[in-house]
Amino acid sequence: MHRNDSQRLGKPGGAPESLQMANNNFLSTLSPEHCRPLAGECMNKLKCGAAEAEIMNLPERVGTFSAIPALGGISLPPGVIVMTALHSPAAASAAVTDSAFQIANLADCPQNNSSGAGGNPAKKKRKRCGVCVPCKRLINCGVCSSCRNRKTGHQICKFRKCEELKKKPGTSLERTPVPSAEAFRWFF
């Protein structure tokens, strides 16, 4: 056991600091009738009060995050918050760990994906077309310079490089020929 486990689990004389903070922040509106059998187990195993047990069960607020304030000000374990918010046995068993909480947050929050080279974020990354002959080739040739220098270079095999990627980025835009001044002489 960790030396702070007795503090985290709660001593008979007082509730842990994080649970006191939670009790002061948002549990004042909850009443003891919200507790369920799981809350009773919490009270027996962790020696916590009814207010802490209510964290585990919010039956009237199933599936909504509106019952929980912004997570930044709460110092509760993430698994407790996820189980409170989701309140289903399958989700509760999957959301016990910190990593499960982080995975749940990653799906909800949009993130900025910038290019690995640190280039211009507005620049669109060029991708393989997938239909040309080099794109359809599945294995490297093993004889070209890119294949031979696999440890030092990270270039794609010369025989697998897409035809679209071989073209310069500026040539993909069609240029319309600009008429010369002779075409407009009849205006002057």
Curated annotation (Swiss-Prot):
UniProt entry tagged with the keyword Cytoplasm: yes
Gene Ontology cellular-component annotations: cytoplasm
Annotated residues for binding of Zn(2+) 1: C129, C132, C135, C162
ZnF CXXC-type: positions: 122-163
Molecular function via GO: methyl-CpG binding; zinc ion binding
Subcellular location, principal: cytoplasm
Pfam hit, one: zf-CXXC
Function: Acts as a negative regulator of the Wnt signaling pathway required for anterior neural structure formation. Binds preferentially to DNA containing cytidine-phosphate-guanosine (CpG) dinucleotides over CpH (H=A, T, and C), hemimethylated-CpG and hemimethylated-hydroxymethyl-CpG.
PANTHER family registered for this protein in UniProt: CXXC-TYPE ZINC FINGER PROTEIN 4 (PTHR13419:SF1), ZINC FINGER-CONTAINING (PTHR13419)
Domain statement: The CXXC zinc finger mediates binding to CpG-DNA.
Protein name: CXXC-type zinc finger protein 4
